[in-house]
Each structure stands twice: as C-alpha cells, then as structure tokens.
Amino acid sequence: LLNTDRNTHNMDYRWLDLNREPVWINCRGYIIRGDQQEPIYLIGCINEIGNRQKADNITGLLGETSLEKYFKDSVSTLNKGFLIHVGIDCFKMINENYGWDYGDYVLRETASCILSCISDSQKVYKIASDEFIILDTTSSDMTTASNLYDHICKHINQFIEENNFAAVFTISAGILPLPDLSQTGYAELIKRTDFSLTMAKQHGRNCCYIFQEEEYQNFLRIREITNELHSAVNHGFRGFSIIFQPVMDIQQDKLTGAEVLIRFASKKFGPISPAEFIPLLETSGLIIPTGRWFMREAITACRKIRMQIPDFKVNINVSQVQITKSDIITDLISEMDASGLPPA
C-alpha cells in the first residue's frame, strides 16, 4: 500500500489466535493521505471469517455465539424468563427495492428500537440476517413479553414515520417461556424459538405467537411423517398399500367393481389417516409419483381380477394437484397400455 496509489485495502489471510491456532481473517480499510499524498492512516476493520462472529458488524449487537455461551454458562442458574425471537417481515424485499445499504440502515434502526425498549435486565442478540433474540431472565409472564413486543412495534412505527415512510415494514415475533435448560438444551431451545417465529409469520405477520407445546409436537409429527413419505417414495413406495371397497349391483347381488383406496403406515406412528398424509403428499409434491404408483397398482389388480370377473371395474380418486401439475391422462393411458388392460 505504501508503494502504490491505491486508497483501499481488502485482503483475506491467516493469523494465529491466543491459543496459537490459525484463523482466517478479513482486513479491509481506507487510506487517509496527507498534503503530499503520503499515507498517514489506514482506517478500517478486521473481522474473523470462516467462523461465527461474536458480534454483528452492522448492528454492533452480540451474535448467536455469545447467546449460546451465555446459556451454557447459566444452565444451572436460569429458572425463569422468556425469549422473544423477532424477525423483520419481508426483509428481502427491502434489500431488493432499496438496496443493501438501506437494508443495513433498517437493521441498525430496528436494533436501536429494540434497545430503547428493553430494560437493564434484558439482553438482545442478533442471530440471523434479519432476526434478533431478546432474553429476559427475571420474569416468565407472557403478558410482559407480548407487551414488550407491542412496545417495540410502536417504536418501529415511529421510526418509519420520522423517515417519511421511505420503507414501510413490520416485525413478527415468537415468544417462548424458558424451559428447563438442563432437560431441553440450547439446540432444542433455538428450534422452539424458530418454530414460534414461523408460526407468527404464518398467522399473517405483524403479530406475535406464544409457544404452545401441543402445536409444536404436532409440527414435529408432521415433519416426521413428511420425512417418512419422502423415504417411502425413494424406496419403492415402502409403507404404502391399497385396499378395495366393493361396489355391488344390489338388484343382481353381484360384485361389479371396487373403489381403490390408498393407505400409508408409518414406522413410528402406525397407520396414518388419509386425511392427514394426502395433504402432506400434495404440499410436498410427492402426490405426483405416488399417484402414478397408486394408479399402476390399481390397474394391475384390476387386470388380475378380470381373469375371474371379466367386467370388473375399478374407480380411483385423483388429487387436484395431479390434475394441474402433471399430465394425468397420459399417465393413465401409459399405465393401462403397459398392463394390457383395455378401458371399460
């Protein structure tokens, strides 16, 4: 730098930390020159990279590393309190519409609004690009927590108004009473705050959601069943089966066909109601391959039964997702041609 005309410096390289362990850092800055253009100062910053930082460069708040350390150091003494997981709604749109610099400005002002609302006994951490966690270890009162959220919202609205509504945004929050950390652990704690914030956003954003154990367990159940469905589809539709509901000609007392129904048995939960697993197939997109498998099984079964009952017919149900997202007519014709089953 001393021998060039460059005024900026930005370089990644390795240092040794206090334990003589190598760490990657980024050093960047701007050169201040004197009257004769001689370099006088290098103003900038040095950041550790390739590892989680202790503090956030944009807001100056401590980061998740510090939050995790605090909990691990305090696990035996914390017996009450709450967490508020705050997220800026649609923050990506702020960056896209106004640029990253303005997005950073919104982050700093949001942090400032939070800091102006919390008490000396409360702490705030920056844990993700647009998310913060407020920690209170003095009260487990959920009304106190929700009132704090409302207070922060008012300060943010005031900031937006003072900024001439250049960008209008809201925040959502998930509120979690502190559980027994010796039983729960830090990783599970963060999963629960993530769930609470997600629920607040699913409820329409610009609101807070207080953690409910029953809803969380249902969320875990849905996630596990969805994972099992993925695994089943990837392993030859293991766990799926079909059953037949007879269709009778009452006047002739004769079996004429059947409605074919799909069933799924979970390794962990046992038989799952179609009212539960079919919507999961639809939302995950697995209904397309599963529907083809179901169609194939029904047609194959029909062909075998026709050896005994020549005019036997089967009825199958299809999903709206199959109709709109796949060429279901082509699939049906292809499966019938492959089985040698003529249409009724």
Over which residues does each language-model region extend?
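C-di-GMP signaling machinery
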Residues: 48-51, 199-241, 251, 281-285, ...
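Short loop/turn elements at sensory-signaling interfaces that couple input to output
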Residues: 27-43, 255, 266
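Active-site core of bacterial EAL-family cyclic-dinucleotide phosphodiesterase domains
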Residues: 14, 221-280, 317
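Catalytic-core segments of nucleotide cyclases and related cyclic-nucleotide turnover enzymes
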Residues: 149-150, 163-165, 170, 178-205, ...
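Catalytic strand-loop-helix junctions within cyclic-nucleotide turnover domains
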Residues: 34, 135-145, 161-166, 170-189, ...
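Catalytic core regions of nucleotide second-messenger enzymes
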Residues: 125-128, 156-172, 201, 270, ...
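Conserved long alpha-helical elements within nucleotide-processing catalytic cores of c-di-GMP signaling
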Residues: 53-82, 89-119, 125-129, 133-134, ...
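Catalytic core of bacterial c-di-GMP phosphodiesterases, primarily the EAL and HD-GYP domains
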Residues: 26, 218, 252-259, 284-344
